């Protein structure tokens, strides 16, 4: 039974990554935002698979290499787009991922049914707000907002 469960998770993961790839290739959003919007789209279109991948009990599991690579890619995109160092880019990603995961989870559980335009605006607002904590208007770290 465990082997079947792992196979289903593997196939669900393939479908998730295909959804992310389609979102990125569509070029409707900057690359980093496209990843978050793809995550939310997957939650809306594949509710049960989203729950299986991202809302199951993982207390006995190790992180996969794919998850680690996803974080590295996200951090690199943030560093490239903002000029932030690795630690700040990592924190920005974690904080925004929590926001995006919250929206995706509420959509996957039918708590919310928001249009993609509203979600896009909210993701942009959260990104800009979190980024502002790390960068002041002149591009230097602002120690007063930490």
State where each predicted segment sits:
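Short alpha-helical functional segments enriched in proximate histidine and acidic residues
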Residues: 19, 23, 42, 133
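Amphipathic alpha-helical packing segments from all-alpha helical-bundle domains
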Residues: 14, 18, 60-86, 90-94, ...
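Short secondary-structure transition hinges
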Residues: 41-77, 105, 109-112, 117
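An amphipathic alpha-helix adjacent to DNA-recognition modules
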Residues: 1-21, 37
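Amphipathic alpha-helical segments that line or abut small-molecule/effector binding pockets
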Residues: 29-44, 48, 90, 94, ...
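C-terminal regulatory/oligomerization modules of transcriptional regulators
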Residues: 107, 138-146
């Amino acid at each position: 039974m465990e082997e079947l469960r792992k196979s289903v998770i593997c196939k669900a993961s393939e479908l998730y990554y295909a959804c992310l790839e389609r979102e990125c290739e569509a070029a409707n959003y900057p690359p980093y935002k496209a990843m978050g919007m793809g995550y939310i789209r997957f939650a809306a279109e594949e509710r049960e698979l989203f729950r299986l991948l991202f809302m199951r009990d993982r207390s006995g599991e190790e992180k996969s290499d794919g998850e680690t690579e996803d974080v590295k890619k996200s951090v690199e995109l943030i560093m490239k787009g903002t000029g932030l160092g690795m630690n700040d880019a990592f924190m920005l990603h974690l904080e925004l991922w929590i926001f995006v995961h919250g929206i995706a989870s509420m959509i996957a559980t039918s708590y919310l049914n928001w249009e993609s335009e509203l979600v896009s605006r909210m993701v942009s607002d959260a990104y800009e707000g979190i980024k502002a904590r790390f960068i002041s208007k002149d591009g230097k770290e602002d120690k007063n907002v930490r």
